[in-house]
Structures are given as C-alpha cells and as structure tokens.
C-alpha cells in the first residue's frame, strides 16, 4: 500500500481548497467520502463515468476508485447508444462501464431505460400503439437482461413530468397514454426482480413546488394501483444557494410512499461548501435517502462546466466543498 504523507493528509481533509497538485495514487490510501458516507448507514456516494472519461487520463479513474462507491453511465445506457436501430443493440460502451464498476467493487445505477431525449428517430416516429408497446417492452427486456444481477437500481423512467406536475407529451405518452408507466415498470420488474426501480426527474428541489407535488401525487396513485416503483430519483442540478431547500424537498418526496429515494445527478453552480454540505446532510437526515450520485468528477467533464459545479477542479484537485463534505461526515 502506498504510504500517504502527513502533509498530504492535512491538505486532503483541511477545510480549505487544495491549490497544489495531489498524488492521486497516494489518495487511494485515504478514507473516501463514500466510506465516510456509508459509515452513517447509507448505501453509496457515487459519480458518473463512461469509457471516454474513464480512459482519457489516469486521474479520473483513480479518483473514482479512491473516493466514490457507485457509478452511473453518463450516456452509454441511453436508448440512442444501446438501440440506435430497431432490434440492433450495441453494448460496447455500457459493457465497459459495467466491467470497470464491477472490477472495482462499485455499485451501478442503470440510466436510463425510457426517456424522451436522446431517443432515436425511429422510436419517436412510431404512431401505432401496439408497435410502440412492443418496442418499449423489447428495449427494456433486452437491456436489463444483459445486466441482470449487476445493477443496483434502474432509472426506468426519466423526466416524464412538466414543470406544472403534469405528464410530458412524449411519444410514449402521446401514443400509449399514461399506461406506458405501468407497462415500463412491470416489464422491468419481470426482468430483474431484485433491481430497485426508479422514476427520475429534475427540478424536484423545493418542497411545495408544483413539479414535486405532481411527482408525489402521481407516484402515490401508481403505487396504489400496484405499479412496482421502488424509488424516486431527484437529479438535483442546483443553482448557487439552493442547497438549503433540498432537505424539505427530500422529505416531501419521501412522502410519496416508495421504499427509497436518491439524489441521482448532483451538481451545484459554484460548488460552495455550504451548498454541498447542506445536500449531503439532507440525505443523511432522511431515512429513505439511500445515496447520492455526483454528476461528474472534475469540472472540465461537466455538462455545465462553465459553472464549475463539481467537487474536483480542472487539475483534478479536490475543492473546498470536497473537504467540507469529508469534515462533515
């Protein structure tokens, strides 16, 4: 085991941002924020990856191995990646992610089976109900079967709500109707009964917001109808200062009646220590919140990189927010 120098330890867990380079390999001998988070009874504190970000340099995978306990594929399990043409599946990218995660002892969240975006044109152009139902079932069955027993949780449905809490007019809703929700979850349950099945969305960050209310009321209705929804995922893409609202939002989502909830795509504009600690504590204090996934490792790889929203800077050094989380756990 690589010995971690006392100076490096002091830098890593100090409450200030680290400005000098850190030996990434040495950091693997330290206690990870995932390990500290799990010591409080949670399942994981994770991040995202795909073949490109896992192979572009040595620092990104080293940080994932050292500090995070779970991986979500950023793009490689989305419909346009896995079934670009009807019945023709491609799993090279998702296989790489799953193999990396398993070989390094990381939990995996499958993301995502049904989403209106990054959807191939051949799917969005379907107008026949029975055809779309068949396509939907086949896609879910094929993707989930390949990874059966390897995925902790699946985002079965992603971003199906409008901001007013009503259901989005996607091809699935427009052609099949609301029943596509039941079809998707029942199909997923039949394929892998042991995987946790989630409905995932963004802007679920303030209690009382119409989208939160819509999610809660719909999930309550669907659960009462026997639809097998295990969890609600709150993406939690936040603006600066919004971390304080997350605790109330999680409590509201927990009231929907699922067995668990999770923060699934966390990033925060400006990455302030206060915001990040507020979010981590919100999950710690809500018994149904099983884990947090940060939507990226270092700022250059973020989908909103100009906002510097992640825990590591452009040199892959941990920021003040990382150290604040470590100190808070």
Swiss-Prot record:
An annotated Gene Ontology molecular function: endo-1,4-beta-xylanase activity
Induction comment: Expression is induced by oat spelt xylan but not by birchwood xylan, xylose, or xylitol. Expression is repressed by glucose. The promoter contains 3 creA consensus binding sites, 1 xlnR consensus binding site, and 3 pH activator pacC consensus binding sites.
Temperature-related behavior of activity: Optimum temperature is 60 degrees Celsius.
pH-related activity note: Optimum pH is 7.0.
E.C. number(s) listed in UniProt: 3.2.1.8
Chief place where the protein resides: secreted
Signal peptide bounds: 1-19
UniProt note on regulation of activity: N-bromosuccinimide completely inhibits the catalytic activity.
Protein name (database record): Endo-1,4-beta-xylanase A
Species of the source: Talaromyces purpureogenus (Soft rot fungus)
Gene: XynA
């Amino acid at each position: 085991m690589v010995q971690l120098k006392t100076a490096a330890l002091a830098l890593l867990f100090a409450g200030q941002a680290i400005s000098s380079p850190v030996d990434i390999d040495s950091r693997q001998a330290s206690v990870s924020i995932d390990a500290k988070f799990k010591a409080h009874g949670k399942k994981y504190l994770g991040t995202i990856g795909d073949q490109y970000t896992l192979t572009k340099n040595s620092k990104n995978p080293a940080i994932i191995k050292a500090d995070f306990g779970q991986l979500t594929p950023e793009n490689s399990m989305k419909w346009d990646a896995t079934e670009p043409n009807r019945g023709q599946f491609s799993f090279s990218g998702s296989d790489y992610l799953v193999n990396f995660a398993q070989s390094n002892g990381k939990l995996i969240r499958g993301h995502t089976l049904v989403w209106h975006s990054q959807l191939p044109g051949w799917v969005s152009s379907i107008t026949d109900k029975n055809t779309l139902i068949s396509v939907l079932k086949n896609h879910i069955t094929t993707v989930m079967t390949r990874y059966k027993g390897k995925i902790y949780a699946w985002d079965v449905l992603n971003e199906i709500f409008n901001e007013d809490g009503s259901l989005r007019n996607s091809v699935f809703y427009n052609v099949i109707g609301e029943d596509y929700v039941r079809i998707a979850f029942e199909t997923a349950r039949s394929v892998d009964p042991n995987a946790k099945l989630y409905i995932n969305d963004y802007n679920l960050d303030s209690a009382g917001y119409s989208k939160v209310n819509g999610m809660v009321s719909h999930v309550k209705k669907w659960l009462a109808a026997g639809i097998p929804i295990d969890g609600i995922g709150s993406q939690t893409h936040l603006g600066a200062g919004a971390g304080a609202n997350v605790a109330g939002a999680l409590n509201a989502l927990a009231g929907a009646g699922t067995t668990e909830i999770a923060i699934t795509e966390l990033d925060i504009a400006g990455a302030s220590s206060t915001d990040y600690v507020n979010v981590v504590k919100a999950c710690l204090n809500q018994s149904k919140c099983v884990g947090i996934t940060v939507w990226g490792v270092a700022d250059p790889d973020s989908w909103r990189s100009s906002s510097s929203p992640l825990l590591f800077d452009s040199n892959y050094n941990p920021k003040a927010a990382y150290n604040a989380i470590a100190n808070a756990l």
